[in-house]
C-alpha cells in the first residue's frame, strides 16, 4: 500500500505543528474574534465602534531575508517581519489592523520550525494589536529544497470612511517626519546576501547574521496614537524601492518630497553595505536608510507629533518637506 507519507507529505507532522501553533495564535485574540482556530474560516465581528467602517487589506512576504534565517537556523523572528510588512502598509491609510492570516510553504514540514515561524507572526500581531485568526501550512515535496520555507501574511484593518488618509490633503510646505527603523527591515536582502556571505562575521560586537535578522519595526500603536490627536496628511512605509519609490506613493497631486540628507541619522549597517560597493543613490533606492515610516503633516503639528512619537518610545525627527510641482523625491 502506498501512503501520502511515501510521497513526502507527513500528516502527523502537520497535526503536531497545528497543535504547537494554536497556543501562539490564541494569545493574540482580541474582542471581535468569534471562532477558534481549526474551522474552515476565521471570523471577526466589526462591532459598533465605527460609523461607516471601511475594510483595508494588505499582503506581503518576508522575501529573501528568510535565507538568512535558514543559514543561521533562527526562525522565531522572521514571523514578526511578515506581520510588520502587512500591518505597516495598511496603517498608511489610517487603518487599525484587526486580524491577520499567515501562509507557510515548504518541501518537508518540521513542526518545530513551523511553530517558530508562527511564534514570530503571533508576536508581531501582539505588537500590532490584531488577532491571528487563521492560516495555511502547505507541505509540497520536491517544490522547495529541504530546510527552506516561504512565509507570507495577510492583514485586514478598519478605518472610518471619513478618516481615510489618502494624500488628498497634502499641501505645499507640509513637513515630513521620519520614524527610525530598527535596521534593514525586510527589503534589499538579495543585494545584501550578494555582498555578505559569512553570517558569522563580527559586526559591532555581534554576529552580522544576528544584525541582519533584527525584526522589522511595527509602527501601529504609536502612529494610531498620533492619529487620535493630529490631522495627518499622508503616510509612507519605507520598504522595497527605498525613499524614491515609497514616499511619492502618499501624494495624489504633483508634489516633490525634498529630503534633507544632513538630517538623516544613517545606521552603521547601511554604511557598511555602502562600503562594500553600493553607491549612495542606489542605497536610497533600495533600503530604508534608517527611516522606516514617514508622516506628512502641517508645520504647526510637527512638534506635537514628534513629542507623541517620542512618548511612545520612537525616535522621530523632521527629515524634509513637501514642495508643490514636479514629482518624486529630491535628496539634497
Curated annotation (Swiss-Prot):
<dbReference type="InterPro" id="IPR016188">
    <property type="entry name" value="PurM-like_N"/>
</dbReference>
<comment type="pathway">
    <text>Purine metabolism; IMP biosynthesis via de novo pathway; 5-amino-1-(5-phospho-D-ribosyl)imidazole from N(2)-formyl-N(1)-(5-phospho-D-ribosyl)glycinamide: step 2/2.</text>
</comment>
<dbReference type="GO" id="GO:0005829">
    <property type="term" value="C:cytosol"/>
</dbReference>
<dbReference type="InterPro" id="IPR010918">
    <property type="entry name" value="PurM-like_C_dom"/>
</dbReference>
<dbReference type="InterPro" id="IPR036676">
    <property type="entry name" value="PurM-like_C_sf"/>
</dbReference>
<keyword id="KW-0547">Nucleotide-binding</keyword>
<comment type="similarity">
    <text>Belongs to the AIR synthase family.</text>
</comment>
<keyword id="KW-0658">Purine biosynthesis</keyword>
<protein>
    <recommendedName>
        <fullName>Phosphoribosylformylglycinamidine cyclo-ligase</fullName>
        <ecNumber>6.3.3.1</ecNumber>
    </recommendedName>
</protein>
<dbReference type="InterPro" id="IPR036921">
    <property type="entry name" value="PurM-like_N_sf"/>
</dbReference>
<keyword id="KW-0963">Cytoplasm</keyword>
<dbReference type="GO" id="GO:0006189">
    <property type="term" value="P:'de novo' IMP biosynthetic process"/>
</dbReference>
<dbReference type="InterPro" id="IPR004733">
    <property type="entry name" value="PurM_cligase"/>
</dbReference>
<dbReference type="GO" id="GO:0046084">
    <property type="term" value="P:adenine biosynthetic process"/>
</dbReference>
<dbReference type="Pfam" id="PF00586">
    <property type="entry name" value="AIRS"/>
</dbReference>
<dbReference type="GO" id="GO:0004637">
    <property type="term" value="F:phosphoribosylamine-glycine ligase activity"/>
</dbReference>
<dbReference type="GO" id="GO:0005524">
    <property type="term" value="F:ATP binding"/>
</dbReference>
<keyword id="KW-0067">ATP-binding</keyword>
<dbReference type="Pfam" id="PF02769">
    <property type="entry name" value="AIRS_C"/>
</dbReference>
<dbReference type="GO" id="GO:0004641">
    <property type="term" value="F:phosphoribosylformylglycinamidine cyclo-ligase activity"/>
</dbReference>
<keyword id="KW-0436">Ligase</keyword>
Amino acid at each position: 500500500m502506498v501512503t501520502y507519507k511515501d510521497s513526502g507529505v507527513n500528516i502527523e507532522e502537520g497535526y503536531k505543528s497545528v497543535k504547537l501553533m494554536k497556543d501562539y495564535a490564541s494569545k493574540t485574540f482580541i474582542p471581535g474574534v468569534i471562532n477558534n482556530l481549526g474551522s474552515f474560516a476565521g471570523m471577526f465581528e466589526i462591532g459598533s465602534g465605527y460609523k461607516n467602517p471601511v475594510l483595508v487589506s494588505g499582503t506581503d512576504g518576508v522575501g529573501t531575508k528568510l535565507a538568512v534565517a535558514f543559514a543561521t537556523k533562527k526562525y522565531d523572528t522572521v514571523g514578526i517581519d511578515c506581520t510588520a510588512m502587512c500591518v505597516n502598509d495598511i496603517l498608511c491609510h489610517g487603518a487599525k489592523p484587526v486580524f491577520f492570516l499567515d501562509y507557510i510553504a515548504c518541501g518537508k514540514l518540521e513542526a518545530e520550525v513551523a511553530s517558530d515561524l508562527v511564534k514570530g507572526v503571533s508576536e508581531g500581531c501582539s505588537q500590532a494589536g490584531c488577532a491571528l485568526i487563521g492560516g495555511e501550512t502547505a507541505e509540497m515535496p520536491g517544490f522547495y529544497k529541504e530546510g527552506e520555507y516561504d512565509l507570507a501574511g495577510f492583514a485586514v484593518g478598519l478605518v472610518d470612511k471619513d478618516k481615510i488618509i489618502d494624500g488628498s490633503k497634502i499641501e505645499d510646505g507640509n513637513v515630513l517626519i521620519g520614524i527610525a527603523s530598527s535596521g534593514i527591515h525586510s527589503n534589499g536582502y538579495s543585494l545584501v546576501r550578494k555582498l555578505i556571505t559569512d553570517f558569522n562575521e563580527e559586526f559591532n560586537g555581534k554576529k552580522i547574521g544576528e544584525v541582519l535578522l533584527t525584526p522589522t519595526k511595527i509602527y501601529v500603536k504609536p502612529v494610531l496614537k498620533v492619529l487620535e490627536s493630529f490631522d495627518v496628511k499622508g503616510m509612507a512605509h519605507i520598504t522595497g524601492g527605498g525613499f524614491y519609490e515609497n514616499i511619492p506613493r502618499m501624494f495624489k497631486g504633483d508634489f516633490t518630497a525634498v529630503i534633507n540628507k544632513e538630517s538623516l541619522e544613517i545606521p552603521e549597517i547601511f554604511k557598511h553595505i555602502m562600503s562594500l560597493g553600493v553607491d549612495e543613490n542606489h542605497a536610497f533606492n533600495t533600503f530604508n536608510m534608517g527611516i522606516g515610516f514617514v508622516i506628512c503633516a502641517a508645520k504647526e503639528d510637527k512638534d506635537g507629533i514628534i513629542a507623541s512619537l517620542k512618548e511612545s518610545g520612537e525616535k522621530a525627527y523632521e527629515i524634509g518637506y513637501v514642495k508643490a510641482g514636479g514629482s518624486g523625491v529630491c535628496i539634497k
